[in-house]
Amino acid sequence: MAAVSKTKRTRRRKERKNIERGCAHIKSTFNNSIVTLTDTAGNALSWASAGGLGFRGSRKSTPFAAQMAAETAAKAAMEHGLKSVEVYVKGPGSGREAAIRSLQAAGLEVTLIKDVTPIPHNGCRPPKRRRV
């Protein structure tokens, strides 16, 4: 029987980048909110989503869930030295303003807020209206 060599895979520790200015991309849909903090080139420093924090079902789409996601992502990015962000908001969800306020409350200086929601030039057919 051949001896199987067990090579231990060492996980590289995340090095602390020293980035002071960056971007916050907030994607707020009807079902979830995702907050990604990047440097100015677009390389992700940290991200968090409402679903990833344990919110499930209808609680996932609340402003409070978006606030918690933004707070979690901001704390992780501030470990890399992030101080000020430009905020780009995408989507029609309820967590847009809550996420921006949460970034400010976490200690990040918001220098710009821009809505980058994609608007179709009569592209795909929208989902049918709900009859409740």
Curated annotation (Swiss-Prot):
Pfam families named among the record's database cross-references: Ribosomal_S11 (PF00411)
Its GO CC terms are:
ribonucleoprotein complex; ribosome
Please give the Gene3D superfamilies that the UniProt record associates with this protein: Ribosomal protein S11 (3.30.420.80)
Which GO molecular function annotation, any one, does this entry have?
Answer: structural constituent of ribosome
* One record GO biological process: translation
Tell me the keywords, alphabetical order: Ribonucleoprotein, Ribosomal protein, RNA-binding, rRNA-binding
The UniProt entry, under SUPFAM superfamilies, shows:
Translational machinery components (SSF53137)
What does the subunit comment say?
Part of the 30S ribosomal subunit. Interacts with proteins S7 and S18. Binds to IF-3.
Q: What does this protein do?
A: Located on the platform of the 30S subunit, it bridges several disparate RNA helices of the 16S rRNA. Forms part of the Shine-Dalgarno cleft in the 70S ribosome.
User: What family does this belong to?
Assistant: Belongs to the universal ribosomal protein uS11 family.
Q: What is this protein called?
A: Small ribosomal subunit protein uS11
The protein's organism comes out as Clostridium tetani (strain Massachusetts / E88)
- From the UniProt record, report the name of the gene that encodes this protein: rpsK
